[in-house]
A protein has these predicted regions:
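N-terminal structured subdomain of primase-like DNA metabolism proteins
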Residues: 1-98
């Protein structure tokens, strides 16, 4: 008896970070450079720069929009941008980065 199937890797945050950095993912989806300063929000109409990036005490990169209170990681940003749940966001990222 022969089984014909492929085992796909488990997609989680750790798996994604084995391949690219948080900065790479965040910059790709926000369309913004990851540096100090304020930027216009890519998620809503914004006439005054209100978005910044910062690192948490444990080193995670965070997107912070002072205009609407959004405070998310790169996965959270994808969830908000595409209006999907966590696992769907992981799948989108994995597919985009092949």
């Amino acid at each position: 008896m022969q089984l014909d199937f492929e085992i796909e890797p488990t997609i989680n945050k750790e798996y994604l970070l084995e391949h690219y950095t948080e900065e790479t993912y965040m910059s790709y989806y926000t369309g913004l450079p990851i540096k100090k300063g304020l930027f216009l929000s890519p998620l809503r109409e914004d006439h005054k720069p209100s978005v910044a990036f910062y690192r948490t005490p444990n080193g995670n990169l965070i997107y912070k929009d002072f205009g609407d209170g959004t405070h998310v990681s790169f996965i959270g940003f994808v969830m908000k941008k595409y209006m999907v749940r966590y696992y769907q966001a992981l799948q989108i990222i994995a597919e985009d980065f092949g």
